[in-house]
Regions:
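Short amphipathic alpha-helical patches
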Residues: 31-46, 116-120, 153-163
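Generic secondary-structure transition motif, activating predominantly at the C-termini of alpha-helices
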Residues: 12, 23-27, 133, 137-140, ...
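Nucleic-acid nuclease catalytic cores
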Residues: 57, 66-142, 155, 161
Length: 172
């Protein structure tokens, strides 16, 4: 199984979400937040698709790649910066490097914040990503889903109902 940017992102956020997604229990199609993210992606930079290339390689899909400058542009709908976004973009750079493309960098863009962050990949990042891949494989190949965690982020997660519906009924 190819590890995708989504796997890296979910690994940073919640191992249970990672396991559910990797084991074909996908709830994103019912999420208003995912839909909102797609809208922002499609409308924030409407002319961008003409200028950049979409790239699919080893299970990753990069929507905006500037081939001339070897720059990945990753757009996030969030109103705050998150490590999960950073590691997802670093993973894209890592995969391109593994496939012989050198000198790649990235930019994380947050239209809601009107902010951009340049992203580079260090040798320490490469080691960390290699370790993450091993840990992700261990998690997703496990017989059972990891235990749910209680975080404020859970409420906005597309898997919220899947994880918490029983507890919601008990407390009401």
């Amino acid at each position: 199984m190819h590890i995708t940017g989504t796997h890296i992102n979910y690994y940073q956020i919640c191992h249970r979400k990672l396991w559910l997604f990797a084991n074909s229990i996908q709830m994103e199609h019912t999420s208003d937040l995912v839909y909102e993210g797609r809208l922002i992606h499609e409308t924030s930079y409407s002319r961008r698709s003409e200028k950049y290339t979409e790239l699919e390689l080893d299970g990753i899909k990069i929507d905006y790649f500037d081939t001339k400058n070897k720059m990945i542009h990753e757009v996030k709908k969030s109103n705050k910066r998150e490590d999960a976004h950073l590691w997802q973009l670093k993973y894209y750079i890592y995969v391109l490097e593994r496939n012989g493309m050198t000198g790649v960098s990235g930019i994380l863009e947050y239209p809601k914040l009107r902010a951009r962050e340049e992203v580079l990949l260090s040798s320490i990042d490469r080691e960390e990503l290699s370790a993450m891949q091993n840990e992700i494989n261990r998690i997703i190949q496990s017989e059972n889903a990891p235990e749910k965690i209680s975080r404020s982020k859970c409420r906005n997660c597309s898997y919220f109902d899947f994880c918490w519906i029983g507890e919601m009924e008990e407390t009401e």
